[in-house]
Amino acid sequence: MPRNVKKNPRDVTKLSGKPLAETIEPSPVLKTLQEGWVTSPDLIEGDLSFTLEVIQNMTVFLLANPNLNSSHLFRADILYDSLGVLSAPHAMEQSRDQGSGGRDQDTQKEDYVEPLPARSVPGFELKRTFVRRLIPRNRNLDRPLEQTCHFYEADELPPTSNSTNIAQSEQCESKAESPRQRFLVIYLPHVSSKEEMPWYHPLLRSLAFLYDFTPNAFPHSSEENKGTGIMSVHFLPYEEEPIQNRLERTLLALLSTHIRLARQTRLDEKPEGGNYNPHKDNVIPKHLVQDTYARLKLKYAADLCQNWVEDTEPTKHVFEDLSITAFLIELWRSMYGVVPADERSPDQKEQGKYDLKFPGFVDVACGNGVLVYVLLSEGYHGWGFDARRRKTWSIFPSSIQERLKEEIYIPKPFADVCTDSEMDFGVKTHTGMFPEHTFIISNHADELTVWTPLMAALSNPASPLPFISIPCCSHSLSGARYRYPPPKPNQKGSVDRPEDQEVEQNPQPAAGDLKALRAAKQKERTDTGAANSMYGSLTAKTVATAEEIGYEVEKTLLRIPSTRNMGVIGGRRRTTQEWTSRVHSAQASQAVGCSAPEAVRAAAQVLEWVAAVVQRECAREGGVEVAAKVWIERAKGLHKGQGKGNQPAH
């Protein structure tokens, strides 16, 4: 199906309709005797309402996110900021407490690139300089490109009037002008000839954006009438290089994208250059996941898609699982200091296929098994299980198939109240008692989503297992479809008890004023996972359940091709601290563990919390025994191939 075409943010009635080559004219700002800078009336858009701060904020945001301008690009890494605000990749890793994990220590040297000199622009003052590295999606087709970006500013006073005619002065009062504010950005690619220019970059020696803003002269202007602005594109072509149709389309698209993004820019909701969503790239820096994903995609995608045997379309599932795998590899690098097989030293490889520092993983409801296959192939030992065997398992090597189990999970609280005959499925069952420190992966596990933190805690109450849960379809603890009520605002970690099922309408803020109410409602609307959707409520329920039984929980938006892309991570920081102590402390057991009596008390507390959650959640269905019977019947259906196959795609 064709992609939805975004509405053009420009006033197309003012465009000439002629080819760009017929409308170019010298740039009044940048043209010199030595450099033939040009622009065009078709590359100018007026009557814009954006303040200078909005344009500057949007421009800085685009520095690290050029993928919004070109689908050929992943991102840009900021290598240099003259103000020291935006960080280079190695600095971002250090700020997130990333372990070196076997990374090349020369990375910091590679991140430094000398900026190209800034040209003098009459009337403008150089304010800031960046160097960025454009990262293509497919490095087999295109190479990364460094680019220097210079920011200039200028203030111009309006022309003075010598008229002493008071009546004329009063008549023109409504047209009074303030000093014009000007913001100029010049982009310089680090190439010595046009032959070195990658495909994704316009074939230009240099590119510039100019924004002129004239504030409203009256101080009490409304928010919508702060002034008017003009945005224009200027460029320095190569000599004797014709203006091709592709370049024309690119320049027009760049101008449209800048206008569209400026309309979406909010000055008070994000740090400079950062994401609007606080849950995006908040656990692992974007560049680490994207680089690993690109490597995995090149290594596995073609073979998996070519040999796909399921009835579903392969690319979506393959790319999604590779994206999640990339995130897990970088997550485990930061938690355990382990690296994929290709990065291990010869001494490490001699010790075996798997890194023994890694405690192992289990992929619950593993489905097609792609995630397990790639993780095992990358040198991380673990296994996966599902209620029924999938056709895809047959395409994997026998060593991988041995790690994919057709087993049914029966939660321990349910197994404790069921008879042996009720537990007889004709297939192996288990209660989720995994080895100590196992990392649990719950990827779109549906019935197991809310059970995931409970399963992790029950497996080792003295030291609950770390986990990641990526919610999808909403189910109660019995496995029946159930839509959880949205969480109450301003109650972090609260859970919906039976007596609290009714959600309060129009809650009042504690501060008691309209400003506080507006802020509370805005936060409620924008806080991912607190939305009133079924998915948002399920995510919030998973978080609340984990927090209630003692987990420190983090939410992060995963870069996967799915709308169900929220990752709920439990126990990451605690596990990272424990593993760091194990590696660096000569008295690891004393440094990491606690005394036996303390461990017993901690385990008893966790079990008490879990029991309270299970009893409360099952109460709506008649109690734990009734919920257990529902779970058993649904599990039998899943084993026969019913249920999940009829669920909508996500």
Swiss-Prot record:
GO terms for cellular component: cytoplasm. Disulfide bonds: none annotated. Residues 1-20, 91-112, 481-513 are annotated as: Disordered. GO terms for molecular function: tRNA (uridine) methyltransferase activity; tRNA(Ser) (uridine(44)-2'-O-)-methyltransferase activity. GO terms for biological process: tRNA methylation. Its EC number is 2.1.1.211. It is found in: Cytoplasm. Keywords: Cytoplasm, Methyltransferase, S-adenosyl-L-methionine, Transferase, tRNA processing. Its main location: cytoplasm. It catalyses: uridine(44) in tRNA(Ser) + S-adenosyl-L-methionine = 2'-O-methyluridine(44) in tRNA(Ser) + S-adenosyl-L-homocysteine + H(+). Residues 103-112 have a biased composition (Basic and acidic residues). Probable adenosyl-L-methionine (AdoMet)-dependent tRNA (uracil-O(2)-)-methyltransferase. Belongs to the TRM44 family. This is tRNA (uracil-O(2)-)-methyltransferase.
